[in-house]
């Protein structure tokens, strides 16, 4: 079946064809017709299965028939995912002179306010920065949001977690009520919190919520083309084993993403690997937004072969040529593992995911294996003797030098300052809101 047969506009089908996207995926075939008919939608599918086009295609089709005001708002948990979605919208709608605004932290808030006042066709935002505008930028800036036709929550499971609660509520409060807009939720992991939304009462005149999930027999949510492996190591020599993995012939020229649990670890690894002459970039919350964007561009262009990242990069990022994901640290949540390894083996390609497992990680690995319904294979290409001979000494020296550099530059001080600023800002917001409540009383 073609996109046009699903109800997608001719101009948009041609745009998809020009991007070499000819045949709809399962989630696109299931969701696009339902969204075009007016259903709210919950879409769950494996990473790399085309979720963005599943919500973009019907929305752009209907927007092109009535392109006035802010037509749709897309909320995402990370800045990088917001930028990527905006790029896809801009590419798909280029022939229609589409205007897309990205509203994320780390960018000039005054410039963003002016963009919102000009009423772009679509806004792609992180909840925190949009909530900031709603509170502080004035009615002229945010009044266009009061008439949006669509609200999309991408990576909905993460957005509906407690960490986004207050900001998300502020964003929802300015939008039209649920009976006057369509709400679309997309995620690779359909959690109970997401699924519960289906059971809410349907407003009068609204169609029932359509839900598309990964089939029960295929509940794994990781691609069948993904090879999942592990290496068991002493925790104090993880860098040496990582060095050995990256030097294996099959990965020496691959695009690889290495995930860590902490920003300090990501920064230490970046500096260590750079001293070992790897072409590396990093992506974590301590970096200014311009540096984060530049790192991604370098990695996508192949100027950096390795991206070292915290979970800020585990959601939604679509870099099809990534062949290897390394879990340098094992995530506490099995769903985070699924999102991390989903950065490779995308759209039918093959990929490898290797987890570096220390003594303390065994319980986490067992929980992950149960969640993905698959046993990891022990990687056979690496021996302890080879690591000691080829990697141990040089990685120890590089790590020590990297650590001294970070200490000298006071890495981490910025985090403390930003935390203090954030707490002060939250205090200001609480005072602001309590004053508003008193005023309304």
Curated annotation (Swiss-Prot):
TM region positions = none
Species this chain originates from:
Debaryomyces hansenii (strain ATCC 36239 / CBS 767 / BCRC 21394 / JCM 1990 / NBRC 0083 / IGC 2968)
Question: Which GO CC terms are listed, alphabetically?
Answer: cytosol; nucleolus; small-subunit processome
What the entry lists under InterPro entries is as follows: DEAD/DEAH_box_helicase_dom, DEAD_box_RNA_helicase, Helicase_ATP-bd, Helicase_C-like, P-loop_NTPase, RNA-helicase_DEAD-box_CS, RNA_helicase_DEAD_Q_motif
Entry remark concerning the domains of this protein: The Q motif is unique to and characteristic of the DEAD box family of RNA helicases and controls ATP binding and hydrolysis.
- Say what the protein does: ATP-binding RNA helicase involved in 40S ribosomal subunit biogenesis and is required for the normal formation of 18S rRNAs through pre-rRNA processing at A0, A1 and A2 sites. Required for vegetative growth.
Gene this protein is translated from: DBP8
What reaction(s) does this enzyme catalyze?
ATP + H2O = ADP + phosphate + H(+)
Q: Do you know which SUPFAM superfamilies this protein is assigned to?
A: P-loop containing nucleoside triphosphate hydrolases
Which positions does the motif DEAD box occupy?
Answer: 154-157
Q: What is this protein called?
A: ATP-dependent RNA helicase DBP8
Q: PROSITE patterns, from UniProt?
A: DEAD_ATP_HELICASE, HELICASE_ATP_BIND_1, HELICASE_CTER, Q_MOTIF
Q: List each copy of the Helicase ATP-binding domain by range.
A: 32-208
Q: Which UniProt keywords apply?
A: ATP-binding, Helicase, Hydrolase, Nucleotide-binding, Nucleus, Ribosome biogenesis, RNA-binding, rRNA processing
What is this organism's lineage? Answer: Eukaryota, Fungi, Dikarya, Ascomycota, Saccharomycotina
Biological-process GO terms, alphabetical: endonucleolytic cleavage in 5'-ETS of tricistronic rRNA transcript (SSU-rRNA, 5.8S rRNA, LSU-rRNA); endonucleolytic cleavage in ITS1 to separate SSU-rRNA from 5.8S rRNA and LSU-rRNA from tricistronic rRNA transcript (SSU-rRNA, 5.8S rRNA, LSU-rRNA); endonucleolytic cleavage to generate mature 5'-end of SSU-rRNA from (SSU-rRNA, 5.8S rRNA, LSU-rRNA)
């Amino acid at each position: 079946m073609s996109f046009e047969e699903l109800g997608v506009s001719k101009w948009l089908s041609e745009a998809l064809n020009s991007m070499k996207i000819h045949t709809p995926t399962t989630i696109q075939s299931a969701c696009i017709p339902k969204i075009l008919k007016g259903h709210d939608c919950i879409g769950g599918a494996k990473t790399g299965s085309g979720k963005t086009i599943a919500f973009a295609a019907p929305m752009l089709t209907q927007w092109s028939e009535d392109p006035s005001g802010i037509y749709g708002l897309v909320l995402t948990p990370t800045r990088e995912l917001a930028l990527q979605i905006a790029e896809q919208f801009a590419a798909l709608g280029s022939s229609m002179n589409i205007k897309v605004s990205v509203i994320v932290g780390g960018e000039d808030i005054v410039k963003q306010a002016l963009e919102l006042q000009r009423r772009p066709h679509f806004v792609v935002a992180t909840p925190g920065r949009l909530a900031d505008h709603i509170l502080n930028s004035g009615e002229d800036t945010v009044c266009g949001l009061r008439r949006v036709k669509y609200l999309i929550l991408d990576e909905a499971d993460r957005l509906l977690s407690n960490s986004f609660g207050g900001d998300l509520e502020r964003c929802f409060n300015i939008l039209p009520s649920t009976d006057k807009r369509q709400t679309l939720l997309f995620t690779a992991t359909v959690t109970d919190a997401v699924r519960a939304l289906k059971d809410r009462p349907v407003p009068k005149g609204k169609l029932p919520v359509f839900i598309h999930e990964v089939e029960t027999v295929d509940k794994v949510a990781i691609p069948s083309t993904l090879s999942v492996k592990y290496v068991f190591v002493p925790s104090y020599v993880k860098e040496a084993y990582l060095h050995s993995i990256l030097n294996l012939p099959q990965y020496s020229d691959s695009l690889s993403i290495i995930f860590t649990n902490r920003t300090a670890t990501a920064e230490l690894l970046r500096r260590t690997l750079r001293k070992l002459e790897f072409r590396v970039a990093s992506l974590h919350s301590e970096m200014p937004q311009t540096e984060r964007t530049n790192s991604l561009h370098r990695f996508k262009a192949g100027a950096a072969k390795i991206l070292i990242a915290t979970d800020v990069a585990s959601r939604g990022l679509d870099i099809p040529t990534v062949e290897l994901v390394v879990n340098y640290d094992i995530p506490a949540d099995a769903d985070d593992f699924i999102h991390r390894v989903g950065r490779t083996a995308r759209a039918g390609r093959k990929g490898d995911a290797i987890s570096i497992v220390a003594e303390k990680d065994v319980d986490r690995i067992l929980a992950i294996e149960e969640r993905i319904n698959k046993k990891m294979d022990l990687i056979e290409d690496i021996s302890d003797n080879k690591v000691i001979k080829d990697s141990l000494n040089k990685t120890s020296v590089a790590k020590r030098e990297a650590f001294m550099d970070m200490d000298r530059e006071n890495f981490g001080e910025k985090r403390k300052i930003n935390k203090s600023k954030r707490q002060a800002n939250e205090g200001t917001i609480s005072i602001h809101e309590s004053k508003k409540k008193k005023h309304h009383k």
